[in-house]
Amino acid sequence: ASVLLLLPEWSWLAALLSALPAAAFAVLTLKLLRQSRRGADVSTAFWRLGMACLLLSSLAASAVALGVPGLELLAGVLFLYGFAGSLTCGMLYKIVPFLVWLHLQRLSQRRFAIPNMKQIISEGWIRYQWRGHLASVPLLALALSWPSRWLLLPAAVSLMLSQLLLARNLCYAVRRYRSAVAAMAAAPVSA
């Protein structure tokens, strides 16, 4: 496909061939997520949204390659914020609690009670951020595709709210870690 980019008359084919693996990856991942035996949690919802946005951005990029005007920003927003942003949030909500739990586990050496991973960041707060993120993806896509003050303001507010909730949740995990470490340090040492 990269050789076709050098030939202007075939660049549309190169773009279509480039979008095909991304779309196939999105469809396959959505299928695997649906077949998973593990219960779906909020981070799985971020992954589902991300894969749906990857599929839609592939379609939008293919339409741009075929000469449909005005979809460039839509393809970019769906890919960068809808796909990459959603997966980043979904992964952060798995990785950060695990790392906090792992470090506390090593520090405690089984002498102290430590919070489990579900207690490090509350599922309810993750769900609040998910709702803000879910609202911000289509609002941002619409606001950048059809610029209007009436669309831009709600998009900006929902994007800001979503990111503030993400920051709040990650800061809460840091606070939980620090308070657990402080409790371990303050505990009397047994001989």
Language-model region placement:
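Hydrophobic alpha-helical transmembrane segments of multi-pass integral membrane proteins
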Residues: 1-191
